[in-house]
Amino acid sequence: MKCHAKRTLAFLATALPLSGKSRACTRTPQSFASGFRAAAPFLFSRCFALCITHCALFHLPYSFTGFSFYFFVFFRLFLHWIYAFCICNSTYVYIYKQVLSLPVKSSMCPSRLSCSVWYRVILTYIYVHCFRWLVRNHLLS
């Protein structure tokens, strides 16, 4: 377990740009593959940990039945793999962390949307842009 944690931290440290400005990702497919092997156990465990947390956000029942539980877990895992690919773009990392650390207050939300809906809209926006960035920079090149 410690070995996986060290490799994951090394992967994250090399993936993050040194400057605060966002820049194009210059990592090779080979380095991404080795980084993914190191990060996969971390992302998988985080996926299970976030599963219950996001149940409240998405208003899902805590008692999952077989298929729905696995679908939800692996869907979250897929989204976090997209985030792992996007981690070398500091803008997305900054926005992602800021959104997850926001205290949800009624004064911060638009008047016609509840806070939970607004929170989901922001996260969906980030995931969509991460996916577009992934396709543009990795799948089409």
Swiss-Prot record:
Main location: membrane
Function: Required for optimal growth under alkaline conditions.
GO terms, molecular function: ATP binding
Keywords linked to the UniProt accession: ATP-binding, Membrane, Nucleotide-binding, Transmembrane, Transmembrane helix
Induction annotation: Repressed after alkaline pH stress.
Cell location: Membrane
Binding positions for ATP per the UniProt entry: 15-22
Protein name: Uncharacterized protein YEL045C
Phenotypic consequence of gene deletion: Growth defect under alkaline conditions and citric acid stress.
GO cellular component, one term: membrane
Membrane topology note: Multi-pass membrane protein
Residue ranges of the TM segments: 38-58, 67-87
